[in-house]
Amino acid sequence: MVPCEEENWKAILKQVEDTECDGIELNFGCPHGMSERGMGSAVGQVPEYIEMVTRWCKQHSRMPVIVKLTPNITDIRYPARAAKKGGADA
């Protein structure tokens, strides 16, 4: 839960890598209380944000990136294409 600013993502990704986890899941499908704060499914409804954040995760980490999309959208193909364009592994 960080702002959509590259430097913030770069910092948090370093912390995530330090945990030695196996990958990153971008939960852009979370509808519960996050969309009101500009996170979760709010980001997942804007393909440009999906592509941008996914790209940052790929650029600033060595881990695979999984993008969890929101079903609360008219056409899931747009966010799916954005995730792919950003370099998502799944």
Give names to the regions the model predicted.
Residues 4-90:
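Alpha/beta enzyme core
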Residues 1:
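Glycine-rich, N-terminal phosphate-binding loop and its surrounding beta-alpha-beta segment
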